[in-house]
Amino acid sequence: MASIDRFQVMQEPELKILEHWFENEDTRRRMDGMLLLDEWYARVNKDKHDTVIMAYDGQLPAGMVVIEFGEERTYIGLIVNPLYRLKGYGKQILQKLMTEPDFTSVREWVACIEEDNRISLACFQAAGFTLEDTEPDEDGFLTLILRN
């Protein structure tokens, strides 16, 4: 059973974990905007509006969450460890993160997911997100929102 027991701000050595996850073809294809990982990490790490968090099941990394805080909306992205996919970890990560004290003040969470990424769409919907519009944007992304 999926169990997330802690979150921690991602540290540079954990990029090795992400490199391993990016060996998965689906991860690489869907998240190619994060490549090269070291350059991506340097950029988000210095932006005060971005936070990257690792989610752990015991000592095992279950997923990574990227959060971009905006004035009205907070954007969220999720990568689940490829070995943990389709086991409820994504939903568990999202639901547990929303109850963390650092994030309970967020009024509106937004996720932009490719229209053909049915697994991610189902994951975010299972965690309480709803479609903002039934049609994708010009880049083929659907926007899902969760209001607190």
UniProtKB/Swiss-Prot annotation:
Pfam families linked: Acetyltransf_1
Domain N-acetyltransferase: 8-148
CDD domains named among the record's database cross-references: NAT_SF (cd04301)
The protein's enzyme class: transferase
EC code: 2.3.1.-
Signal peptide boundaries: none
Molecular-function annotations in GO: acyltransferase activity, transferring groups other than amino-acyl groups
Record keywords: Acyltransferase, Transferase
InterPro entries: Acyl_CoA_acyltransferase, GNAT_dom, N-acetyltransferase_domain
Family: Belongs to the acetyltransferase family.
Protein name, entry field: Uncharacterized N-acetyltransferase YfmK
Gene coding for it: yfmK
